[in-house]
């Protein structure tokens, strides 16, 4: 009986060392060696070297001179500590009213936009933290951004096209644009927008107020 206990104890200790110590250390070491940026959170820095967010977590931009992400049901909006969808079903009256309100707001804020409002701009993602838009949803907002920054529409569209990411491995997912990286590209190309007073006009620059 005692030998059986020792065998079980040795098995338990060896298993804990392998799975609780050696395996995590090996995975962490390989990640830091091969993918240091991704392993540390895919941090994004501005032109002055300041961390302004993560490429994996969306931020809620609202100023006219920046591209806006999808609506978010994560807390008060893009709250990294409260990731969630709206949990509203397709027959929900509340979902219909929310989408209608978003549609009205988008049309009011984008009077020069061509074509119908892209569906993703009136619907939340499952996580509430989606950092991407489709190229079509970004281009739809380009006229507003160009007008707010006082530059030609074609120049803003050039920035959008330069930030389009293709399908992963060429086959997975759809082409997409990272909203934070796109807005940083705008600031590099045309200069940052002047700071807004707290609570007025949304974020003054990418990363301001990021969770």
UniProtKB/Swiss-Prot annotation:
Gene: kdpC
Molecular-function GO terms, alphabetical: ATP binding; P-type potassium transmembrane transporter activity
Annotated family: Belongs to the KdpC family.
Function description: Part of the high-affinity ATP-driven potassium transport (or Kdp) system, which catalyzes the hydrolysis of ATP coupled with the electrogenic transport of potassium into the cytoplasm. This subunit acts as a catalytic chaperone that increases the ATP-binding affinity of the ATP-hydrolyzing subunit KdpB by the formation of a transient KdpB/KdpC/ATP ternary complex.
UniProt KW Transmembrane keyword: yes
InterPro entries: KdpC
Alphabetical UniProt keywords: ATP-binding, Cell inner membrane, Cell membrane, Ion transport, Membrane, Nucleotide-binding, Potassium, Potassium transport, Transmembrane, Transmembrane helix, Transport
Protein name, as recorded: Potassium-transporting ATPase KdpC subunit
Record's subcellular location: Cell inner membrane
Source species of the chain: Myxococcus xanthus (strain DK1622)
Keyword Oxidoreductase recorded: no
